[in-house]
Amino acid sequence: TPMVLLREPEGRRRLLPILIGTAEATAIHTSLEGLEPPRPLTHDLMAILLGEFGASLARIVITEVRDHTFYAELHLVATDTDGADGDEPDHVISCRPSDAIALAVRVGAPIFAAEDLVDECGQEAAVVSDDDDAEEIIDEFRDFIENVSPEDFAP
């Protein structure tokens, strides 16, 4: 099962692992690699529709986990109205984190996770120094990835 790892940009730099579907993993990967399909795929279509209807994705927020399922929100702002400061969304739409991330990487929107969620489900990132055996750390990480299950992140 594919997994996306979100990392805190500063501070403790914990990792938030989220299991996702193969189709969403492919959508995220192709967008990060800058590959463009000959015809718009689902998340490309979502980005096009936002633009056509005068909206933009201000940010996504991974909000919670319930029964081993993560939840996210799209924070949309109207781009064709005066006075929109972008701080308060005009619309908040609940969605799967994988879809939110796939859309965010396409349009360059920031990705956030609720602090209490990171406190609950975040994993400490290994700090690698020059003295550490990088191969051993990589092997440990591979073992973690191969054996991880949704139950490992249950509250």
What are these regions (language model features)?
Residues 1-155:
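Divalent-cation
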